[in-house]
């Protein structure tokens, strides 16, 4: 080569170096990325110096249009991870809160159930106390009623035994006789003046006062005769005996009328109805002192066909409905029912039933209380009524008879 060619070579080399310094070749490599996700471009030196293979990695800012989607995607991925982490923590906290709420709700339900049970027990106790109070008041009321009846009977018996103090001005009516007491001065004035006593209706006048042996005086009011008490002159006694002097004769009475008159006071002294309108005297005249016992006036007893085979049992018949009873007291109570007089009323709440006899009221009250006082000795079964118990005991008797018959058949 010539010298000129040799001279040109270093010149060209210098130019190439300058060009390399001014312009570096940029080579894009797919696998070169930084930890933050940005791309790195490889700069290669010129090929004039093959021996020198120096490689430099220099981060270069890429155009916004190329780098923006990568950074956005990275940011989105980081944001999603950050969102996932708090969302998972929120879910855990929410689950814990829900579990706590469920536990609180369960505890509240248990407390409400316990409160309901307590309220129910308290209500049941109140109801039991009310029923006990009602039953106790009913028993007390019944005992008070029985005591009052006994006191009335005792008072009536004492009145029958003791002399009855009355005044001359007695009132006599066709249905009922009412007696009143007046002051002793009025009695003495009437006795001294020998004047008769006028009745309330003004229809009957008393006979004049007539002296009796021993200084006693006697007054007649129709068919009633009053005699002065020897111990106390201010008291008067009713007597059935007529005056010693001749007077207006009383009309003759039939035996049936006398028996009816005897039955009326017995019914009144037992606290029963006054049957004077039905069985009393036809003329409306007063009645004398009644005996302690009186004969039954039912049709069966009047006809004297009431004795059966053994002659011990009696049957009393109601003349209104032909019902039969074994006791005269039951018949009298039944007659009270016909007259509408039912003195024994049930005191239970919302119960307006009435009865003619106290035992019927007691039997009815057991339907409210549920008491079963009659127990079977064989099987222990309980009943409210004694007749139900006797009917039940017959089943045991029939079973015994059947067993005995079967045993006899086997032995034979």
From Swiss-Prot:
Residues 1-53, 77-97, 136-210, 390-412 are annotated as: Disordered. Changing residue 344 to I: In gu85; fails to bind DNA. Defects in the morphology of vulval structures, resulting in protruding vulva and occasional bivulva phenotypes in adults. Reduced brood size. Embryonic and L1 larval arrest and morphological defects. It is found in: Nucleus. A zinc finger (C2H2-type) spans 316-338, 344-368, 374-396. One of its GO terms (biological process) is asymmetric neuroblast division. Keywords: Metal-binding, Nucleus, Repeat, Zinc, Zinc-finger. GO terms for cellular component: nucleus. Pfam families: zf-C2H2. Residues 44-53, 398-412 have a biased composition (Polar residues). Its main location: nucleus. Disruption phenotype: RNAi-mediated knockdown causes defects in cell fate, embryonic morphogenesis, and embryonic and larval lethality. Defects in gastrulation; failure of endodermal E cells to internalize at the 26- to 28-cell stage. Reduces cell cycle lengths significantly in endodermal E cells. Significant reduction in expression of end-1 and end-3, and enhances the disruption of intestinal development in an end-3 mutant background. Reduces number of offspring, and the production of oocytes is compromised. Failure of cell death in pharyngeal M4 motor neuron sister. One of its GO terms (molecular function) is zinc ion binding. Residues 1-21, 136-158, 178-205 have a biased composition (Low complexity). Belongs to the Sp1 C2H2-type zinc-finger protein family. PANTHER family: KRUEPPEL-LIKE TRANSCRIPTION FACTOR, TRANSCRIPTION FACTOR BTD. Transcription factor. Binds to GC-rich DNA motifs, such as 5'-GGGCGGGG-3'. Involved in cell autonomous neuroblast asymmetric divisions that generate one precursor cell and one apoptotic cell, by transcriptionally activating target genes, such as cell death activator egl-1 and leucine zipper kinase pig-1, in caspase-dependent and -independent apoptotic pathways. Plays a role in the regulation of apoptosis, cell lineage, cell differentiation, embryonic morphogenesis, vulval development, and oocyte production. This is Specificity protein transcription factor 3. It comes from Caenorhabditis elegans. The lineage of its organism: Eukaryota, Metazoa, Ecdysozoa, Nematoda, Chromadorea.
């Amino acid at each position: 080569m010539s010298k000129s060619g040799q001279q040109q070579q270093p010149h060209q080399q210098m130019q190439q170096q300058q060009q390399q310094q001014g312009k570096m070749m940029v080579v894009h490599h797919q696998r070169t990325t930084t930890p933050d996700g940005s791309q790195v471009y490889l700069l290669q030196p010129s090929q004039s110096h093959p021996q020198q293979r120096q490689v430099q990695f220099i981060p270069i800012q890429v155009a916004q249009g190329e780098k923006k989607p990568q950074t956005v995607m990275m940011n989105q991925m980081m944001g999603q991870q950050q969102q996932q982490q708090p969302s998972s923590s929120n879910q855990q906290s929410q689950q814990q809160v829900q579990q706590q709420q469920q536990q609180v709700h369960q505890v509240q339900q248990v407390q409400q159930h316990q409160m309901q049970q307590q309220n129910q027990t308290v209500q049941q106790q109140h109801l039991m106390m009310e029923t006990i109070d009602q039953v106790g008041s009913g028993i007390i009321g019944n005992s008070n009623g029985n005591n009052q009846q006994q006191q009335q009977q005792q008072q009536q018996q004492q009145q029958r035994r003791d002399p009855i103090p009355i005044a001359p001005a007695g009132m006599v009516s066709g249905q009922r006789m009412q007696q009143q007491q007046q002051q002793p001065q009025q009695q003495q004035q009437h006795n001294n003046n020998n004047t008769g006593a006028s009745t309330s209706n003004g229809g009957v006048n008393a006979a004049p006062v007539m002296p009796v042996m021993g200084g006693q005086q006697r007054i007649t009011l129709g068919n009633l005769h009053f005699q002065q008490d020897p111990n106390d002159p201010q008291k008067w006694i009713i007597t059935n005996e007529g005056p010693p002097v001749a007077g207006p004769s009383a009309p003759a009475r039939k035996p049936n009328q006398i028996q009816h008159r005897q039955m009326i006071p017995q019914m009144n002294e037992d606290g029963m109805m006054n049957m004077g309108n039905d069985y009393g005297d036809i003329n409306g005249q007063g009645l004398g002192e009644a005996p302690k016992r009186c004969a039954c006036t039912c049709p069966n007893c009047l006809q004297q066909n009431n004795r059966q085979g053994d002659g011990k049992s009696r049957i009393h018949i109601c003349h209104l409905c032909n019902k039969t009873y074994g006791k005269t007291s039951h018949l009298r109570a039944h007659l009270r029912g016909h007259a509408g007089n039912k003195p024994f009323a049930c005191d239970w709440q919302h119960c307006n039933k009435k009865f003619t006899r106290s035992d019927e009221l007691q039997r009815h009250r057991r339907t409210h209380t549920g008491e079963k006082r009659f127990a079977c000795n064989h099987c222990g079964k309980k009943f409210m009524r004694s007749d139900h118990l006797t009917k039940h005991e017959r089943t045991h008797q029939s079973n015994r008879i059947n067993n005995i018959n079967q045993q006899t058949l086997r032995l034979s």
